[in-house]
Structure formats: structure tokens, C-alpha cells
């Protein structure tokens, strides 16, 4: 019973104008017909809910009077403050200011009194404190007639509405493009900038331009360190009071506004527009379309953020590492890496987070609530997105279709990877290698590969680089600066990416799982590269032999086979290698260590992959089969070498005489004819041989001669 009465008191302090969303005439004109219908439904539903709380009919606010006959909501007269006229205050609001229903002379929790003192504009009241509660005393000059003075009957409402319509006709300034009228010439000028695209107000710090001066003022606060609005719970400060209010909802966890479609709830009265925007997801509305790539969004803010992908504008720079971002929120999240600021604590388990959204996501692990259930197999999910993704496994539905070749895919990322073949959405093409790029900045950076220009030189060692970011990274190796330290073992790193990779060695976690095969990875970049295997896309092709690869790194490693460059030399035997990993594997021959032992037969191996391949012999596993003749192999390399018999491919060509070979060892043996090098020496007689097998045959002669 006590809970019910406290709930009634909270409702009693809420007015319709606290929860109503207002549109100006200009803003209302930007909505399409579907959005206007959705807005009307939400406002009428909100008013009905308030009437249900009171339990009887109350005089209607002016906004509802206009919405019911489907008139324009901006016709409601407002004062300069943007609030409805005092004469149109709702009966609900006035009723709850009467001594019978108001909070005066009632015992309330102290927390409620503190909240009321912040939001109420009632003056002349006194508060008396008791054990666990407080009482607001009625002001001496308060009279019951004052509460009912603002109630408006239907006759007054009708008179007022007709005056409102007459007032709106007095708008002499008309827009030549769309015909809208304005009562003030300055409002017309501001409106015309929408059609012209003119943005005369420029930020002196980053050069960004805006249509209106208030937009510029709001933006400039992001450059200054001034954050006057501080959270009294965690101490975090903000540029704007609205940001502080949104932030406080994270600590309270209040989400009173619930979506009837999916049950998702939203935080506060001030953010009812979030519910309004969320409902457009269920309605399937995506009115905001990108002019560059055609992608559509249900929110204008999402479109604006997306459009920055196509531009080169990254005005927000990290002062610690120099990394640049398109959005201020991305920079703010990134800065938490350097500061390790974790202000958001879970009250259930004490775990702390650097971002409020991470804390909200973490809350779901305690509730274990999975409201979205699959009607086919009964599996439940936390988010509707996960359910939609799961349901695709039960059907053959492939909704993501390629417009150029009619290939269809179950998931969006598969289509994106496939579209690389057609170079869709990459307007910048390199004339030297025909590679396509989405951004002009990436295209310019790529061209320096062909020109060989390396304008950025290191003052310490003289090494030159193509890009400035490469120079900045390199210079950290000369300095002892390692700002990213592991809290577990104290090891420090030059880059945050190195620290993140290192942290997985302590946890052993592989959180990024492939939905196709179930394989998991430590890093999301590894998962992205792995997904290309399932899509079958091999966009990186060797110009020398035509072989294709699904990773650029594999192509670069392969191209070293065609060149004579072997920079990694073994100090024990002088053998040289194209890749450092090959040298590392080779050096295990000299140290003699065979750490990986087979449990079946006791055979020991130097490298783990050798043990894995050996174990296939015991299980008679040969997963790599030739499509031409059906022959199977233990290793993929064995299959690739075998396929050259069918294709006739000879990738190893001698630059001296032009002769080509199928196998690398044949090419090396032939190349020694031109160089005159015979690296295999007999320890008995000192004779040299071109091939290792010739040395073995020769040594058998000495073995026969020995008694």
C-alpha cells in the first residue's frame, strides 16, 4: 500500500508538457507523412496514459486539441521560453496542485524531497525533517482558488484556438523555394540556408561550418576544456546540462518508457524522443538516405555520422598519440585507453567500466534476461538483433543480394566482402595497378608506393617513410617512451594495440567467434581476415605468376619468392630466407630442440604444426583432396604442389636464361649453374656439390670404403 501511494505522489508531480515533444513549423515540415502519423499516435497515447492515472476526464491541452482533428501541432502558441501558455495549462496539472492532491503536508522520502527541490519552481515553502522522511509545509499565502485559476473550459479553448489560427496568418515573409511563411525576416533568412546549403558560421579551431550561430556555439564547447556541469555521484563533467542529465540516468538505472513491440525501455521523460525514434525501427522507416552510397537510416544523426566516412574530415585529435577521429564521442572513448578512467561501477559485482554503455550492457549479465525467443527451436536471446541473425539459420533466406552479379548472401558482411570484386563504391582507381579506393586520402597514400617517394625522414637514424604516421610510430622506438603498461605483469609497450594483444596472453580469452565454423579469435582483425575464407574471395593477385590470395600480407610474402631478396640470414650456416618466420623455424635445426612429442608413437618434432601434420598419419586423415584425380594429401602445401601437374604451372622462372620450373628446389639447383656456387661440401674429401642429394650419394662411397 505504501508503495502504491509513493508511486501516486511521483505521478502527481508530472505534467503533460514535461513529456510532450514540441516541433517548430520548420521542423514539422521536415517530417514525412508516416512520421507525422507516428508522432500523433505517441502524443495521444501519452495523454491517454495520464488520464488513466487520474481516473477521470480532464481538460485537454492545446496540443491534443490540435492533434485529434489532425491539425498542425506547431499552431499551439508558445511564449518565448518555448513553453505552452499559462492559460492552456492542463486540468491534470492544476488538479494536482490543489491541497488535496499535492505533496504539501505529506510524508515523503528524503530522496524524493531532494529531487522535487531541483525540479519544482514553488517558492515560499518550508521543509521539516523526521526520521527517514521529510514534510513540505504549505506556504502561508497559498489558496485553493489559485490552483483552479488556470483551468480552461471548452468554450475558452475554442476562442483561443481561433485566435491562434488568425495569429498564424500574419506571416508576411514567404520562402520562394517551398512556399513556407515566416513572421520574422531573420527566420526566413535562416530557413533559406537549408535550400542554398550555405553555412556561413565557421569554427576557427577545426574549420567546420554551420548554418546557425547557435550550432556553432554548441560545437565550440567541444574544443574548450570548460565543463561546468559535474556529476555529483562520479565527478564526471560535461559541456551541456542535457548531457549531464542523460549521464545521471546511468547511475539510477531508471527506464520508465517501454516499447510495446519488443519490450525495450528508455531512460527518462526528457528522452521520450528516443522511444519515438526507436519505434521507427519496427515501422521499417528509414527516411534519411546517403547521397553517396544510397544507404538509408532511421535517424538523421546516424546519417550525419555515416557521411563522415566518405569525407576526409577527422577534426578530433588525441593529444597523447595523435590518432584522429571523425566524431567527438570516438575520441572520448579512445582517451580512456590512456587515462584508464573507469568511473562507472556495477552495484551488483563491483566491476568498473570506462564507458556508461559498457555498464548498461554488463547489467544484462546479472539479470540473465533473454526476452527474445525463437519460435522454431525455442532458443532465447538478449537482443532482437541476435534473434533475427539466428532465425536466418532455419531458412534458406539470403536477403543480401549483389546488384551486379545477383549473388545472394545470408549476412551483410559477406555481401560487403563479395562486392570488393566489383569495386562498388570505390571511385578512385590507381592507373599503375588498377586497385580501387573508397577515399581519396587512401588513394593518394597508395600512389606513393609506385612513385617511391618517402618524404618523411627520421632525424635520429635517417630512415625515411611514405607516411607521417609511420614516422611517428618509428620514432617511439628511439625514445624510451612506452606509455601503455600491463597491470598484470608490468610490461610496457609503445602502442595500445600491442598492449591489447598482450593482455590476451593473461586471460586466454578468444571472444571473437566465427558464426560459420565456430572458430574463435583473440582479435577482431583476425576474425575479419578469417571470414574471407568462407566468402571465397581472393582479391590479391600476383602479377608474376597469377596466383591469388585472400590476404594482402600473404601476397607480399609470396612475391618475395620471385625476387632474389633474402634479407634474413642464419648466423650458423649462412642460409638466407625471405621471411623472418622461416629463419626462426630454421634455427631450431641448429639448437636440436624437439619439444613437441607424439603420444601415439613417441616421435618428437621441432614445431607444433609438424606434430599436427604427423598425427594425421595415425588417424589416416588426408583432408586435402585433388579435384582432378581424387588423390588426397595430409598437407595443403602437398596439394598445391601436386596441382601443378594438372595445370602445368611453372611459377619459378630464371631471370638469367628464362627457363621455368615447377618446384622451388629445381629452380635453386638450376640457378647455381649461373652463379657457380656449390654449397654442399663433403667433410671427407672436400668435394662440393650443387644438390644435397648428390652429396648423400657421394658420401655413400666413403661409407663403403670404410672397414
Curated annotation (Swiss-Prot):
One of its GO terms (cellular component) is nucleus. Belongs to the krueppel C2H2-type zinc-finger protein family. GO terms for molecular function: DNA binding; zinc ion binding. A zinc finger (C2H2-type) spans 173-195, 201-223, 229-251, 257-282, 288-310, 316-338, 344-366, 372-394, 400-422, 428-450, 456-478, 484-506, 512-534, 540-562, 568-590, 596-618, 624-646, 652-674, 680-702. One of its GO terms (biological process) is regulation of DNA-templated transcription. Keywords: DNA-binding, Metal-binding, Nucleus, Repeat, Zinc, Zinc-finger. It comes from Mus musculus. This is Zinc finger protein 60. It is found in: Nucleus.
